[in-house]
């Protein structure tokens, strides 16, 4: 029995800007939430102010395009929308003011 391929996340960050810790934190957040549903979370060093996140090759966050860095909950929602759209992310899906 062959299982479906697991998602690959790549976080490309600017080494000149020293964004490795931010990229690592985002990777940790995704791994904590999705665990074994992810096949890989890669940190990819880059330059020139880059901070991009892809899921299975699809660009889901780009710092310049999207106006800065993602909040963890937004990034989790975008990954979820690709790998498991029916999944409830619990508190990460609730808006401010929604009942708990």
Can you say where each PLM-predicted feature lies in the sequence?
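Amphipathic, hydrophobic secondary-structure cores in small proteins
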Residues: 36-52
